[in-house]
Amino acid sequence: MTKLPRTIRLDPSDTFIFEQAAEPGEWAVSGSFAFLDREPSMLTRKERTALRSGFLGLRSYGWSTLCVVVEASDEERAEAVDQLAVYLREAHGAPSQELAMMAAEEEIAFAESLCQHPVQTILAVQRDVEETGEIRERFRTLHARDRSGDPDPLHANLRAFTIVEKAGESADPIDEVDLQAFLKTDKT
């Protein structure tokens, strides 16, 4: 048993920002190799987004902004290597199946190394292209905020805004707003 990254979609934004979005639940690799022989200035906007912040899904060969660390069996790992080897042959012209398998094994081993975190840890990547053309990757983990003291922990992470009472402010709500008076005020 090992751990590998699996694509996750928290909202539909990946379907808008990438040319091809990975489906949730695909095994994933960093995927930076997909840009090694490409001039960044020649990439489309969506391709640049994938270069900057995408993980490559191994079923659709689409991109995902986030991955989650999950356990994987030896068979699932071998399947991921096979899927990636096919992609390396078909899309990137690996000269032989043997070389494609070696490169795929190396990529999957790197993906495993990213998963030294607890299961369910969310991973994100940020890439920059150096002046030399080298791609620099930085990986980070995202964690849920501790809401253990929240009176409504089930919905605590769903709030877009939190209302906080400030000391010295009236707790009584304003019942009426006079919009006509507001419109007549001098705005200079």
What are these regions (language model features)?
Residues 63-76:
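Extended, non-catalytic structural segments that build the interaction scaffolds
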Residues 110-120, 128-188:
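Alpha-helical oligomerization segments
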